């Protein structure tokens, strides 16, 4: 099944197998619909995954699918990327990394320490209200945060992000703010291949892309795969792009 989608201002075509849609995604969509009706308020669901697993694409596809399934309640996909700390903040702050070295936040942008977790918690709590404040988004053109740019309108809010189920530091316990959680896993080797290819497609040389993976992306991948809390639904991404219930 193909869908023309837009994520972070970029258009692309997402493709999922018919069997994956019928056996995994439609049942998930209908379960969220049932939960929302049962609780009779805005439902918040998390879709967490390591970098490179395709969580943003999957969340956008789920929104698209919900609009084309008459018996489903339409959902809205939103990302936690809008809760990156602004570049000005990153440039002025540092943290101690996994090797015990103090590093500038900007050099590790995308690591768990470079997000406004308190702001995300507040936004999740507010999202249950009848008139929630708009969410910030992340511009892939400016490579920075755009404040209060996404109105929250639908009865089901599907929040996607790397660290939503991270079981350490300020992230621990964030899942308590969700009604339902999904974790999408993938083999580290597959994620490495996809992330390096993404960097090369963005203009980096293969050598630069591999170096960035070792210095940044790979560390984030390992952290999410090893240190995530159990989800209500665990999915696995195959090398062929297939989805299965783990």
Predicted regions and their residues:
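Conserved nucleotide-sensing/catalytic segment adjacent to the nucleotide-binding pocket
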Residues: 76, 83-139
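Conserved lysine of the Walker
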Residues: 55
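Small-molecule kinase domains that catalyze NTP-dependent phosphoryl transfer to phosphate-bearing small molecules
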Residues: 145-148, 169-172, 197-246
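Pre-Walker A adenine-sensing motif
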Residues: 26-38
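Walker A (P-loop) phosphate-binding loop of P-loop NTPases
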Residues: 52
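Charged, amphipathic alpha-helical linker segments immediately N-terminal to NTP-binding catalytic cores
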Residues: 1-24
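Hydrophobic positions on the alpha1 helix immediately C-terminal to the Walker A/P-loop
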Residues: 58
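ATP-dependent NMP and nucleoside kinases share a basic, alpha-helical "lid"
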Residues: 142-198
């Amino acid at each position: 099944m193909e869908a023309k989608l837009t994520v972070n201002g970029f258009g692309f075509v997402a493709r999922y197998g018919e069997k994956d849609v019928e056996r995994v995604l439609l049942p998930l969509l209908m379960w969220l619909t049932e939960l929302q009706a049962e609780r009779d308020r805005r439902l918040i669901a998390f879709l967490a995954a390591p970098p490179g697993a395709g969580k943003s694409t999957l969340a956008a596809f789920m929104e698209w699918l919900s609009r084309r399934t008459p018996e489903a309640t339409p959902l809205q996909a939103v990302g936690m990327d809008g809760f990156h700390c602004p570049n000005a903040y990153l440039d002025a702050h540092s943290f101690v990394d996994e090797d015990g070295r103090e590093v500038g936040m900007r050099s590790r942008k995308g690591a768990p320490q470079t997000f406004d977790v308190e702001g995300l918690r507040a936004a999740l709590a507010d999202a249950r209200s009848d008139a929630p404040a708009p969410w910030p988004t992340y511009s892939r053109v400016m490579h920075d945060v755009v404040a209060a740019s996404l109105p929250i309108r639908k009865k089901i809010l599907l929040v996607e992000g790397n660290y939503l189920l991270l079981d350490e530091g300020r992230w621990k316990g964030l899942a308590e703010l969700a009604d339902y959680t999904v974790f999408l896993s993938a083999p580290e080797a597959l994620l490495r291949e996809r992330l390096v290819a993404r960097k090369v497609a963005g203009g980096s040389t293969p050598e630069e892309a591999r170096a960035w993976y070792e210095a940044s992306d790979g560390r984030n991948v390992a952290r999410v795969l090893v240190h995530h809390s159990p989800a209500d639904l665990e999915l696995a991404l195959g090398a062929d792009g297939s989805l299965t219930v783990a």
